[in-house]
Amino acid sequence: TQKKMTTWKSQLFAGVVILILFTLLITPLLALATRSIASFDTRSEQQGVLTSGITFENYRQLTINRRDSMFFVPPTTAIRNSLLYAAVVVILALVIGMPAAWALSHHSDSVFNRYIDPVLMLPLGTSAVTLGLGFIVALNRPPLDLRASPILIPIAHTLVAFPFVIRSLAPSLRSIKPRLRQAAAVLGASPYDVFRTVDLPLVGRALLVAATFAFTISLGEFGATALISRPEYPTIPLMIYRYISQPGATNYGQAMALSTILMVVAAVAIVLIERIRIADIGEF
């Protein structure tokens, strides 16, 4: 049973911890948002030199190809790419992760679980940069020469998000009482029907949580994407890196603006997923 914090010391401690966590979470986000509408000294090559005034010039500059670069990509294209990749990652991660989590939940005390589960968790212990470099080295010859293909990005994102999907689904699948499956089988349901009519409805919340994890991880993934992405198919994090790696106050302001856009897109995506969920299923 959970104990309520009745003493003023415990309440004060909890309040301080919450305040610190809230500050550490909100302060960086507010800093990005405020700097995205701040004016910078464009005559200075130093990044982040603030001047007085509020402006949306940084957002307007995102649509202007100031250097007439052939690799210029408007932010709408980067946002579209990121959302498309994230949608594909959600589908791939759930299609692969659901059977894997189901197998792990049905062999929780076996040698299969003991050795296969750590293998499936390898992306958590491996840097995304290492994963991207491995793709470049391994997939460099026909018929698996995918280095120039945009499909490589959602594949990499799926591998990064895969462990989170399994960890979200496996506990829910393990919590399903065996007698429910047995009752469905006695009534004549096939193994597929048992999975469809018993398992899936009971893990609806976990499925939505897993989908949200996969979606947001894909939106913000940078390490592997930086190595395998093509210049004409950038994501929002890559565009932010392009701006922040170039000197000048204008590029710095554009990086702040695009970072704010990424923050808003991720927040809107999570809210939409929460809004379209079935009532009482998938509640966070």
Predicted regions and their residues:
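Transmembrane alpha-helices
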Residues: V16-L30, L122, T126, L159, ...
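Transmembrane-helix boundary motif in ABC transporter permease subunits
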Residues: V88-L120, V137, R141, P178-L180, ...
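Membrane-interfacial helix termini and adjacent extracytoplasmic/periplasmic loops
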Residues: T1-M5, T42-G53, I64, F72-T76, ...
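Interhelical loop and adjacent transmembrane-helix boundary motif
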Residues: T1, T6-S10, S36-Q46, G53-M70, ...
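Hydrophobic positions within alpha-helical transmembrane segments of bacterial inner-membrane proteins
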Residues: A86, V90-M98, W102, H106, ...
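N-terminal signal-anchor/first transmembrane alpha helix
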Residues: K3-A31, R114-I116
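Short hydrophobic faces within alpha-helices
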Residues: I79, A103-L104, L122, R179-L187, ...
